[in-house]
Amino acid sequence: MRDSSMAILPEDHPLQDLEAFPVEALCKEPFLLPEKGSKAEISGIFEHSRLTPHVPFPTWGNDAILSMVESGLGVSVLPQLVLRRIPYRAATRPLFSRLS
């Protein structure tokens, strides 16, 4: 079984009302890329779309990423399984690419 990746963004993000989040929009925001775990899979999403995210600093751990997103420090992508029962105030959306 393959776990889908989901965009995670602050609840007050201007695009949080979209049904699905465009991968291209992730490159217009500070992107919180995990240093371990799902880094290769997430990097592959950008490579497939020929995009380069703006990663302002290394981020360790899903909880740190979720807390930073909740605080408005950036957006991220995490596996759907991680996001099933998050205690953080953040919006999650499926991803799509206009370039695919």
Question: What is the predicted role of each segment?
Answer:
Residues 3-4, 18-20, 63-100:
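Beta-alpha-beta core module
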Residues 11, 36-38, 79-82:
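Short secondary-structure boundary segments
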Residues 15-16, 29-49:
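Secondary-structure junction motif
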Residues 33-35, 52-64:
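Short beta-strand-to-loop elements that line the ligand-binding cleft
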